[in-house]
Amino acid sequence: RQSLIGHFLSATNGAAVARGTSWLLNSIGSVVLPENLSIIEDPYRPRVSSSRPFDAEGLETKIRKIVDNGILCDWTTDLSSSRKLDLKSTGNATRGIGSIPMPSNWNISLTDGTKSQSELLKDMGCGILVTSMIGSAINPNTGDYSRGASGFWVENGEVQYPISELTIAGNLSHMLRTIIPANDARQYISRVVPSLLIDGITIAGS
């Protein structure tokens, strides 16, 4: 769940957008999630490691909506990428001791759903409960997505047995527009993302 939202955030990174290597290019104002879901960045959450009042370039951080009710609102930028995009920096520069500033996200939360993970499994009926992801192959220009995975086989809404050495594939744009969140997000970590039910993924494995 966190990795899927992480791939989305990578596509909203101003450096990738400025290079033209984002599958969300030209998508500001477009529908990218179900209409009841938002992604909010809050750099002021107490006792969370990614909280900070200023970014690495000395600009004040702010609470902002990256996605508002399914609509993409904003890129994530530092001074360099914002100049290239003719925008104002969102105050998201980060850097290491010997590296140049790059855009990065602070604390992120995705709107919680109304059902538990168990209820979503019953809604799914038959499918896979993914618990671990391995490697990745993502086309940054198209959003085509393929990753190794392991987890549990689910039948009639009930977990049956563990499975591994699977490959799951799809297109991130389609996957994200169909997600249904559970209500189990952990509130004490930097990325508050619940379990996600996703339809239409291709699964391969023996």
Regions found by a protein language model. Give the residues of each.
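Dual-mode signal for accessory low-complexity, basic/Gly-rich regions
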Residues: 12, 27-206
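Active-site pocket-lining segments that scaffold enzyme catalytic pockets across diverse folds
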Residues: 1-24
